Every structure is written in C-alpha cells, then in structure tokens.
C-alpha cells in the first residue's frame, strides 16, 4: 500500500496566523476527488472534520512524522459571510446545506418529529451554534472519574485542557459595567479558540442589570464568572469570537493556520461508511475505513496506527453499527454480522428548549445577553418538595422504564447514573436549568432543562451506510421530572419578566402570551410545553465513556472496547450531560485524547 503523505520536516504556518485571512489557498488544497487517497495509507484517519476532529488533527500533525487524513461530508464554510461569521445571525443558516437537519422519529410525547440542527462542514456545529463559552460544575466532571471509572477525567485535568484551548480577552470597562465579570484564573490566554464579549457597538440594555437586581432580591448570586466550575446565578458570558466579532469556529482556528502542513490532508464531500476490521487476530483491529457517497462507488483508505471517529453523537454510533460493532439485536435486524456486541447508540441525552418572550419599553432598548443558571430548588420554587419526592422515590422505576423504551440496556447500571444526578442536584446545588436571556428587541428567554433523566437512542435502520437511514429517538419528556422541570423553569422565566425591577421594561408577553393563562398551573405549563419546545442540539452519550459493566462503549482513553486501534473522540462519549454550553468540554476532550494518542504513538516507535 502506498503512503499518502510526506513525513519530511517542514515549518508549519504559524499558529498566530491572522484570522482575517480567508480561503485564499485553503479550498484549493482540500481534496474532493476520492481517488486521491483511495488505497493509500496514513498513520491516522479521522472520520469527521468538526470540532474534535480538526482539533485532534491539528494536535497530532504538530509532529511532522505523523500523517493524518480527515474525511468530512461537508466543505469549507468559514468564509461564507455573515450567515456563519456573525453570531447575531444565529439560526438563519438552519435549513441550508450547512445544516444536517437530522430528523427524529415521531416522538411519543406529541406524535410529532423534530429536527436536530448540526453543522455540515469543516468545523461542524461550531459553524452554526450560538458561540456561548461556559464551563460545567466541577462535581459533574469529577463524577466521570469517581462514578464512571474514567481515570484522569476530573475537573482539574479537564479544566486545564479547556484553558489550554482558550485565547481569552478580558471585558473592557463598558462591558464590565453592563454585567460582564472576568476571573483571570478561570481563563486561558495563549490558546487557539478566541473568546471574548459579544459587542455590536450599541449601548447595553438596562434589562440585564434589572434581572440581576430581581434575582438578588431572591438571594441568587450575580456577576460570577461562568467558567470557574460553579455556574450559578445571573451573569453575562463570553463567546467564541474575535475582537472584530467574527465567529471563532474550529475550521478557522485549527485548520486554516495548519492546512499547508504536508502531513495533513483533508478530503471533503465524502461519507465514512464503516470501519475496516482485520478479524484474523484474537481481537479485531481497525485497519482503515470505507468511504464514498453511495454504495455503488466506494473506496478504501488505510490507517497504520488508528481510526478515530469524530462524526458526532448522531453519526459515530452509526459508523460503528455499520462496521458490526453494536447491539446484536440491532445488527440482526438490518442483516449485519456482529463483530463486537456493545451498547452502541444508547444513553442518548439531549436537552430541551422553550421560549418565553415579552415586548419591552423603549427604555429597555439595547444589546446584551445573560444567563441564569438556576438550581433545582430555584427552578421548582414552591413545587420543590414534590420534585424532591420524585427524586427520592422514582429512580428505580425511571430506570426500568427507560430500559423498556430502549434508551438503555441495564436498569441497575442506569440507576447509578440517576443516583449521580440526584447527588449533583441535592448535595451540590448543581444548576438544573438555564434561563438564557437575549435582549435584541425583546425580553427573550430560552429555557433549558440541563439535566435530563430521560434516555434515548440512535440506531441504523438499513445496512447501506450511504443512505444514512437511522432512527434517532431522544424520547423527550418521557421522564416526568424532565417535563415538570422544563415547565417550572419556563414559569420562572415568565414570573421574572414582570417582577420587581424588570417591570420597568415589561410591555406585554408575546410567548406564550394568550396561549397560556398567566395563572396557569404547572400541569398547564407541562401540557403547553409538549407542543411548544424544540431540541437543544446538545445530544451526548451514544458511545459513552465508562466502565464496560456500566454500559460503556469506550474506555477512559476513548478506545472502543474489544477493538484494537479504534477510538471515538467526539460528543458521543461524555457519559453525562453538564450544566454548561458544551464547546469548552469538547475542546478539552479533544486535546486530552490527542495526548493519549500521541503517548501511544511514542511508545510504538
């Protein structure tokens, strides 16, 4: 087999390459002809050029002796213009070719389907997300080690990698006065991802200060740095953008400065269908991938060291299943021989979002975003005793119900997850919901249920990987606590919008508005929410990193159990949800796993 790339030592483009250099040269350097790599060999193949894929590719190819091929279904989109570059255009690109728009199954909650927005292009969902930069609670990350058996996956280590990825700018005096707070000890300043305050240049709205005053009267903290491991209360937050307000996406930061490395190649417009496995040894070994655009025209490329799956929490489990790695019951249904029986595609955990919006008076005009990370008790308010009663009496029942619905495979193991969540909420006051405030022309809250107890799944439904036929069922709100938690958080947002200092700027509610009486009960809210929510597009867990006996698909080095030379390195592997926007976690994951890969590479030489 021929070698695809030169391993000669050259000086790569500087990491500090100005971000405003657009695509001059890069698109011409990206491969589009599959025959350019077919039949050849590299050290590492990365299936997926999103956040984790490009971060890992950049880190591995710092060593000029390591050759890497990234295969991505989309194309280079970072210079598309305001639709990508402007965070204030969030949502406008949905429905375009840069959005996978995966469709769920018909949901049992409401007999409707939903679309899962996911970036299709180099950079993945960093092309289309809202760019919010926060970090989880320390105890959440610590539990990955203490509860799930992932040695080294604790707050101290993961936070260090997260800071390594970050190039933060402190807020200026105007931004601090508006409500930003910056703790230098919680930020990196020499990393790759540019992070700083969003600022259109307009005056900031007084509504954020009013919200802070309102919650302070409730005993809730304000103006905390949400990157320090204890997100709680109301604060403004930084975003992934440059000082000139251009989006800092993964392709712009990890590929654009490095695409001229002779040991890195990127093939676009191609799907990875399955992993090629050598089954002649006691343990199957990944030796390459099959890729293409349809089954009549496929190609193989080979990996000397490892195959790394980075196609996202919806697609990486599909690639495994098409490779014969998954639940035998699923693979038998589509006629694929089982090579390794693992609970692939289970433990899917996504959050939900509901809007509560009001008109504002002219005095409230101005820019600004903030978030209220609310604890379990703050979310439920007067309903907290009933909510605690559910936590204390229903965990076993919920686990059995989730297994019966196909969201997990072992009720005893799932109860361990639920007990971990209960510990977070009851003993550590981990944020349970997020009320995300945007003041662009309205008092617009979007409310998230951060810690879902429901479990869903993703499984292939056809043996042809290029048809991408699969069942994606997050099973939203099939757990009663999730539904009532979303209802309580939404009710809280309505109450805050017309309370205390916020009243000054309140000019009438538009959503739910007349669709839900102002004195609606929690049950009324719950019924309304079933038909008026959307997914949050933060699905995790479908190739969970945990002990095998707990339901793990990969170990603490992201290696697939029972297969040599194969890892999953993306959002499939977190075993839990977190009280945070997830980019900080995913960048840390990619860098930490990259170091594990490099250590294995060094030991092989």
Swiss-Prot record:
Catalytic residues in the record: 538
Chain positions recorded as O2 binding sites: 559-560
Disruption phenotype: Completely eliminates gluconic acid formation, both in vitro and in fruit. Results in a significant reduction of decay development in nectarines and grape berries. Decreases the expression of the ochratoxin biosynthesis genes.
Cofactor(s) annotated in UniProt: FAD
Gene Ontology biological process: secondary metabolite biosynthetic process
GO CC terms, sorted: cytoplasm; extracellular region
Disulfide bonds: 186-228
UniProt catalytic activity: beta-D-glucose + O2 = D-glucono-1,5-lactone + H2O2
Alphabetical keyword list: Cell wall, Cytoplasm, Disulfide bond, Extracellular matrix, FAD, Flavoprotein, Glycoprotein, Oxidoreductase, Secreted, Signal, Virulence
Signal peptide range: 1-16
Binding residue positions for FAD: 51-52, 72, 125, 129-130, 132, 272, 571, 583
InterPro entries in the cross-refs: FAD/NAD-bd_sf, Glucose_Oxidase_domain_2, GMC_OxRdtase, GMC_OxRdtase_N, GMC_OxRtase_C
Cell compartments where the protein resides: Secreted; Secreted, Cell wall; Cytoplasm; Secreted, Extracellular space, Extracellular matrix
Function comment: Glucose oxidase catalyzes the oxidation of beta-D-glucose to D-glucono-delta-lactone and hydrogen peroxide in the presence of molecular oxygen. Acts as a critical factor modulating pathogenicity by controlling transcription of genes important for fungal secondary metabolism and infection such as those coding for enzymes involved in degradation of the host cell wall.
UniProt subunit comment: Homodimer.
Protein name listed in UniProt: Glucose oxidase
Organism of origin: Aspergillus carbonarius (strain ITEM 5010)
């Amino acid at each position: 087999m021929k070698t695809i790339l030169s391993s000669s030592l050259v000086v790569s483009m500087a990491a500090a390459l100005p971000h405003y250099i657009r695509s001059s040269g890069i698109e011409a350097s990206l491969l589009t002809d599959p025959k350019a790599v077919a039949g050849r060999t590299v050290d590492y193949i990365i299936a997926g050029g999103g956040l984790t894929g490009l971060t890992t590719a950049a880190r591995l190819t710092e060593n000029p002796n390591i050759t890497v091929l990234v295969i991505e279904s989309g194309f280079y989109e970072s210079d598309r213009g305001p639709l990508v570059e402007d965070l204030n255009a969030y949502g406008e690109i949905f429905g375009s070719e840069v959005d996978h728009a995966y469709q769920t199954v018909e949901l049992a909650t409401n007999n409707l389907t939903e679309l899962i927005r996911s970036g299709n292009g180099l950079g993945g969902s960093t092309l289309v997300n809202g760019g919010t930069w926060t970090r989880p609670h320390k105890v959440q990350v610590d539990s990955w080690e203490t509860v799930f058996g992932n040695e080294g996956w604790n707050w101290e280590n993961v936070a260090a990698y997260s800071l390594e990825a970050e190039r933060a700018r402190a807020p200026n005096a105007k931004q601090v006065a508006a409500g930003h707070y910056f703790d230098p000890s919680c930020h990196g300043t020499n990393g790759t991802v540019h992070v700083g305050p969003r600022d259109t240049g307009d005056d900031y709205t007084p509504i954020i200060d009013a919200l802070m005053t309102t919650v302070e009267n409730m005993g809730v903290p304000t103006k905390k740095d949400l990157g320090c491991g204890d997100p709680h209360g109301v604060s403004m937050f930084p975003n992934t953008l440059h000082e000139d307000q251009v989006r800092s996406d993964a392709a712009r930061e990890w590929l654009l400065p490095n695409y001229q490395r002779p040991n890195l190649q990127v093939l676009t417009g191609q799907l990875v269908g399955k992993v090629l496995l050598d089954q002649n040894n006691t343990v199957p070994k990944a030796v390459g991938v099959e890729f293409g655009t349809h089954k009549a025209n496929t190609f193989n490329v080979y990996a000397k060291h490892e195959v790394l799956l980075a196609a996202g929490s919806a697609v990486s489990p599909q690639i495994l299943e098409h490779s014969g790695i998954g639940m035998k019951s699923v693979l038998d249904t589509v006629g694929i021989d089982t090579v390794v029986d693992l609970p692939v595609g289970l433990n899917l955990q996504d959050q939900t979002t509901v809007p509560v919006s009001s008109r504002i008076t002219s005095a409230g005009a101005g820019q600004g975003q903030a978030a209220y990370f609310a604890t379990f008790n703050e979310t439920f308010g007067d309903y907290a005793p009933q909510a605690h009663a559910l936590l204390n009496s229903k965990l076993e029942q919920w686990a059995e119900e989730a297994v019966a619905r196909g969201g997990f495979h072992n009720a005893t193991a799932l109860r361990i997850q639920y007990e971990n969540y209960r510990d977070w909420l009851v003993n550590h006051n981990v944020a349970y919901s997020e009320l995300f405030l945007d003041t662009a022309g309205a008092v617009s809250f979007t409310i998230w249920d951060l810690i879902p107890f429901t479990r869903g799944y993703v499984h292939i439904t056809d043996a042809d990987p290029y048809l991408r036929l699969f069942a994606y069922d997050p099973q939203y709100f099939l757990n009663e606590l999730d539904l009532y938690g979303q209802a309580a958080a939404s009710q809280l947002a309505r109450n805050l919008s017309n309370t205390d200092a916020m009243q000054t700027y309140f000019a009438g509610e538009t959503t739910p508005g007349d669709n839900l009486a102002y004195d609606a009960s929690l049950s009324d809210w719950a019924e309304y929410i079933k038909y008026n929510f959307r997914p949050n597009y933060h699905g995790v867990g479908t190739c969970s990193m945990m002990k095998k006996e707990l339901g793990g698909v990969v170990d603490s080095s992201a290696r697939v159990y029972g297969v040599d030379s194969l890892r999953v390195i993306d959002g499939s592997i977190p075993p839990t949800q977190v009280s945070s926007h997830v980019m900080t976690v995913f960048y840390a994951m990619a860098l930490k796993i990259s170091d594990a890969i490099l250590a294995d590479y060094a030991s092989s030489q």
